[in-house]
Amino acid sequence: MIPKKLVHFEYIQINLASPERILQWGQRTLSNGEIVGEVTRSETINYRTLKPEMDGLFCERIFGPVKDWECHCGRYKRVRYNKNSEISIVCERCGVEVIESGVRRHRMGHIKLASPVTHVWYLKGIPSYISVILGMPRKDVENIVYYNNNDSISFKNISQFLTENRFFSNSTDILDDLLNIKEKEEEISGGEAIYKMLKNFDLKATAQKIREDLAENEAAWTQSSFFNGEDSDWVLDENQWNKKNQDWQIEEERRNKKRNKLIKRLRIINHFIATGAKPEWMVLSILPVLPPELRPMVQLDGGRFATSDLNDLYRRVINRNNRLAKLNNMLAPEIVVRSEKRMLQESVDALIDNGKRGKALVGNNKIPLKSLSDIIKGKQGRFRQNLLGKRVDYSGRSVIVVGPNLKLHQCGLPKEMAIELFQPFVIHTLINEGLANNIKGAKKIIQNSDPILWEILNQVIQGHPVLLNRAPTLHRLGIQAFEPILVEGRAIQLHPLVCPAFNADFDGDQMAVHIPLSLEAQTEARLLMLASSNLLSPATGLPIISPSQDMVLGCYYLTTEDIRLRGTKSHYFSSLEQVIMAYDQKKINLHTIVWVRFSGIIDSKYIKQNPIEIRVDSLGFVSYIYKNYQMRKDFKNNLISQYIRTTPGRILFNQVIQNSLDYSPSEY
């Protein structure tokens, strides 16, 4: 057996595949010189022997043996026939290569189409690359591909034929020429017509012509040239000026549309030139067939089989392709051949992207068949589901709920989830502290949920950050680190201020939890990824941590005052603590207007206002009464006391801010 070679590569590029490349994928030469790879039959397995049919969709000669080191007929079995051999053995009777069955996961086949068909992505996509390249409306291209039009070329040929002074020829010559015209009409229909048009398309010459047209268009048309016409010497009144300006705007809009169309066409042509792809590769003459292990057929209980939808789509293509080849050999009527070509085009469209053209093909259960595009696109597709979104160990997932008692860098982790995620660390700690003799004993403690377990778990999670991720991760703040806090229930608790960074809300969103294992990963998470260290948006530099929704509403509710209490008897307190005490004793509510003695610095805007009332007592003390402020001074103008008008809610709000800032306020 040939040893496997390691191939090093730097990147993967997705490009158009040429017919030669597709043939190279699905065609191989066996050690006996036989060339295999073409799938010519639509059968899958034999209903009696349950073995794959030869030259079918599961053929062992094309894709490899079903069982390791065993051919189709059973002549070669076990590994001893191929041990220490650089050249694989091919069975002389059935032609199957005696090799491992794992090759059925990557060996491809191919179908040679009896008539070229267009690739539905490049015909029905936005933009339609085929129509843009050819400079034709997409509807006209579709009419040619699906045989929906009356060919203008055929009528042109007939009119040209009738004007060539041939009216006096015999009927046999006229009939021969009309048949020749019919043959010419056949050459310009369907995918074959598109293929010939694309094959004869000169990319570089067309690109140069478009550049010249763009330059000429820019130079020839300016606003000044439009207004400097034959009436440029006349003084225009307002109505004439408005009409001419309106005409110019219409012409400018038309010119911009033409310019954008040329730029779009030039951009696509430049991509073809840069990548080395040829436009005719958008028309398929050879269709690749996926390896059978990627479209399996599984036997169920009771003898029934479950098969991939791709097998039904491939079967439809093969049946129509074989029928078209048979009709071509039979010299069938043109209308029948056209209908079969159109059906072949539709079957290939359904295989590549079912439902792209219109109504999707459905199976026996009335559910649309899953095509090749459906396998790779979307959330459940190959890229997002299997390549970008692989499942990893030491991770979990749950619904998020708000955690109002958490700090910004903390998250609430359910105990049930935490014991599973941190289980290796818990087992290690249980053994080190002598609470368990081995791993089996430690797992028994975990299964029994002993009270000592939660103490050990709290000890383990101290200083061990976890990573929270919400899909889709559109920027780096989609994954942040938090210190876990054990909570009851099964939901992850999240601080509401970090929701904008994750673009999350609490209407059922789910988030994933990942555990950094190594010391380096934990250090990186703590220093770089902690939520309290990511306050600014990496895109704009603006704060991404900002209160919103219920937080803003709560702050407003806390600091508002009840206007219905205006004009009632005011309450006076000698300190802020007395106000809080009265609120705790339910003597007043959050919105009660109170006057409280305050010894701090008052904002100067209150003092600059004119007082509402000035009182002077018998001792010469002066009281200045403002709308929200009162102060009392002695006869030497020394401040004795000052009161401010506020509410208990504002006092609580101010204390929370003071405690978070951890400094004495300079103003209230």
Curated annotation (Swiss-Prot):
Q: Native species of this protein? A: Mesostigma viride (Green alga)
Q: How does it assemble?
A: In plastids the minimal PEP RNA polymerase catalytic core is composed of four subunits: alpha, beta, beta', and beta''. When a (nuclear-encoded) sigma factor is associated with the core the holoenzyme is formed, which can initiate transcription.
By sequence similarity, the record places it as follows: Belongs to the RNA polymerase beta' chain family. RpoC1 subfamily.
Q: What does this protein do?
A: DNA-dependent RNA polymerase catalyzes the transcription of DNA into RNA using the four ribonucleoside triphosphates as substrates.
The UniProt entry's GO biological process terms, in alphabetical order, are: DNA-templated transcription
Keyword Magnesium tagged: yes
Extract the signal peptide range: none
Tell me what this protein is called. DNA-directed RNA polymerase subunit beta'
Q: Name one GO cellular component term.
A: chloroplast
Q: Does the keyword Cell division apply?
A: no
